[in-house]
Amino acid sequence: MNAYERITRNTAEVVTEEEVRELAEDPEGKRVYVGYEPSGVLHLGHLLTANKLMDLQDAGMEVVVLLADVHAYLNDKGSFEEIRATADQMKAQFLAYGLDEDQTEFVLGSSFQLDEDYELDLHAMQVETSLKRAQRAMAEIQSGETPKVSHVVYPLMQALDIEYLDLDLAIGGMDQRKVHMLAREELPSVGYEKRPVLHTPIIGDLGSGDGKMSSSEGVTISMEDSTADIEEKVTGAFCPQTRDPEGETVNPVLELFQYHVFPRFDEVVVQRPDEYGGDLVYESYEDLADDLESGELHPADAKGALAAALDELIEPGRQRLREIRGE
């Protein structure tokens, strides 16, 4: 796997391919970031982008994790005191999950977003950006149904963060796409260069395969979940014997294998009794998905292997969270 393939694997969109190929020619020391609102315990949505960050560290890039306390405050996620306490927990969980501490810089948003130069640039972007453009960028990620003035400022700050953190590449889920496109369009208007962007997929709701896996709606898996919790949630997951269910529905079990399990494990062992053919060993997602579609791999057996793998991935962060809480 060459540098470009490693940088872009398991992404939903590369903006632009030409720019990222140029970056991949010499990735050593290049700076890449993801920003997270400190608003709860890490869940599989956070960890999907963390998997991509680990790919980029393997390619030699330096990772910046923005713990966006000001953004979280603007998005009604609590007081600054509450948000910053959560930020400390998130940092510990990310490191326990597998981010290389020597290659990861954790930055609190308020450490630079309240400085005069940043504020003046923010005002300049406000002059250059239409209200409708900012509202469109924020629509998918705002909290609550009532638009607020803070929600319009939020995406402009995300755009400026890319400049002020001295980044070469930005990462986010597809729900961040409109914000990143705004950044590429508007940063040049205030004298800064646009940066390339990678977008990771949005995994479907575990229970239905519709919409997206969410910590606020439907079923998701987080570092608070016990082994039994994970087994219960995965056992009840939607898993038709196909990669491509009808309509906009997806197979979340296969998505979790593709985006969470195979990037972290060299092989996946599906345990089965001898009378049902014995264990199956997979070294690639494609082989596992093929067997599910052919009927060689039963959904119940696939779910058992998935639950075991997710539990192993989450265990270090779960243990760290318990230590922080004194449990």
UniProtKB/Swiss-Prot annotation:
| Cellular component terms per the entry's GO annotation | cytoplasm
Which residue numbers does the motif 'KMSKS' region cover?
A: 212-216
User: Where is ATP bound in this sequence?
Assistant: 215
Where on this chain does L-tyrosine bind? 33, 154, 158, 161, 176
GO terms for biological process, alphabetical = tyrosyl-tRNA aminoacylation
**Superkingdom of origin organism:** Archaea
Enumerate the InterPro entries for this protein: aa-tRNA-synth_I_CS, aa-tRNA-synth_Ic, Rossmann-like_a/b/a_fold, Tyr-tRNA-ligase, Tyr-tRNA-ligase_3, Tyr-tRNA-ligase_arc/euk-type, Tyr-tRNA_synthase
Q: Where in the cell is it found?
A: Cytoplasm
How does this protein assemble? Homodimer.
Q: Which HAMAP family match?
A: Tyr_tRNA_synth_type3
Q: What this chain does, per the record?
A: Catalyzes the attachment of tyrosine to tRNA(Tyr) in a two-step reaction: tyrosine is first activated by ATP to form Tyr-AMP and then transferred to the acceptor end of tRNA(Tyr).
- Enumerate the PANTHER family for this protein: TYROSINE--TRNA LIGASE, CYTOPLASMIC, TYROSINE-TRNA LIGASE
In Swiss-Prot or TrEMBL terms, this protein is called Tyrosine--tRNA ligase
Identify the coding gene.
Answer: tyrS
